[in-house]
Structures are given as structure tokens and as C-alpha cells.
Amino acid sequence: ADFALVDEALNKLGISHFADRIYMLMSGGEKQLINLARILVQQPQLILFDEPTSALDYGNVFKTLSLIKELSLQGFTIIMTTHNPDHPMLLHSALPHSRVTILNEHGKLQTGTAPEIITEANLKALYQTDLRLVDVPALQRQICAITHL
């Protein structure tokens, strides 16, 4: 691979200090970030992120979602799977053109914008629990919340 592309990808993710580390000795979150850098080096037009924030702490979740937003703004087509309904809602606030698709409880696909698809009815049906969408004025968006244990 072109070393300049590798350096650019590591710098974009803020992980240039990982360049001399051994992959097998890294944490799960660090490996996830290295895997993202490996994708960027390939310069694809379409990027599939399969649960890109699993095993990440909140700081790295922020970096990963910010990167996904930036890649989308740069013209990459992004497909992301997630079990966290807050992520597409958060991305929608930055990328209102983005589309969300869910596999509903009947095995059918539903596609639309995050507010159209991520509804309390869909959340309750998908997760079989009492999830609520709560308006958070300070964030100027809704968040998904578990109402009780």
C-alpha cells in the first residue's frame, strides 16, 4: 500500500500513534479504528460499516460517527448496520438526506428518513420492549430511551 495513504488514513482517525503497534496486542476498540483506516486506504466508493461502534467507548463512538458523516459529505456511499437507534437519528441531524432501512417484525424492509422510520411503534416491535423517543431540547433532537427495567 502507498505509505502516504496509510499516513493520511491514520491521521484522519487521529491514530497515527498506532502505526508502530502490533495489531494483535491492541484492544477491541483500537482494532476497530485500525480496520477503519484499512478501509480508507483502499479508497472505495461504497463503504459497508457492520456495527462500527461495537466495542468502542463514547469518545471513539463520536470519532467513528463523525468519520462516517465526513465520508458521506465527501461523496462516499455509506451503508451501516447498527442495533443502536440513536446513531441513525444523530447522523440524520447532520445528514438530513440520509436514508434508514429497517427489517420490521414481519420480515419486510421499511425505508425512509430516520424520523420516518425510527418511531416508537417500530422500536417497540423490533426490540420487544417499551422504548420511547424523548425530545431533548438542548440537543435539538430525540433520543431513544429505555423507560424502565
Q: Where are the model-predicted features located?
A:
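Conserved ABC ATPase "signature" region
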Residues: 1-18, 43
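Catalytic Walker B motif of ABC-type/P-loop ATPase nucleotide-binding domains
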Residues: 47-51
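H-loop/switch region of ABC-family ATPase nucleotide-binding domains
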Residues: 82-83
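ABC ATPase nucleotide-binding domains
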Residues: 114-149
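H-loop (His-switch) and adjacent beta-strand-loop-beta switch element
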Residues: 91-114
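Conserved ABC ATPase signature
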Residues: 22-26, 30
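Hydrophobic anchor residue at the start of the ABC signature
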Residues: 36-37
